[in-house]
């Protein structure tokens, strides 16, 4: 469960960087 959470955060960060 922790690994999927970290993966979700990494994906969110990637999207944020693309938007910025």
UniProtKB/Swiss-Prot annotation:
Protein induction: By phenobarbital.
Swiss-Prot/TrEMBL catalytic activity: an organic molecule + reduced [NADPH--hemoprotein reductase] + O2 = an alcohol + oxidized [NADPH--hemoprotein reductase] + H2O + H(+)
Keywords: Endoplasmic reticulum, Heme, Iron, Membrane, Metal-binding, Microsome, Monooxygenase, Oxidoreductase
Entry GO terms, CC: endoplasmic reticulum membrane
Coiled-coil portions: none
Compartment(s) of residence: Endoplasmic reticulum membrane; Microsome membrane
GO molecular function, one term: oxidoreductase activity, acting on paired donors, with incorporation or reduction of molecular oxygen, reduced flavin or flavoprotein as one donor, and incorporation of one atom of oxygen
Domain of life: Eukaryota
EC numbers for this chain: 1.14.14.1
Cofactor: heme
Record function comment: Exhibits a high coumarin 7-hydroxylase activity.
Protein name: Cytochrome P450 2A7
Species this chain originates from: Papio sp. (Baboon)
Taxonomic lineage of the native organism: Eukaryota, Metazoa, Chordata, Craniata, Vertebrata
Gene, per the UniProt record: CYP2A7
């Amino acid at each position: 469960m922790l690994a999927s959470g970290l993966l979700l955060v990494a994906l969110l960060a990637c999207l944020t960087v693309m938007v910025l």
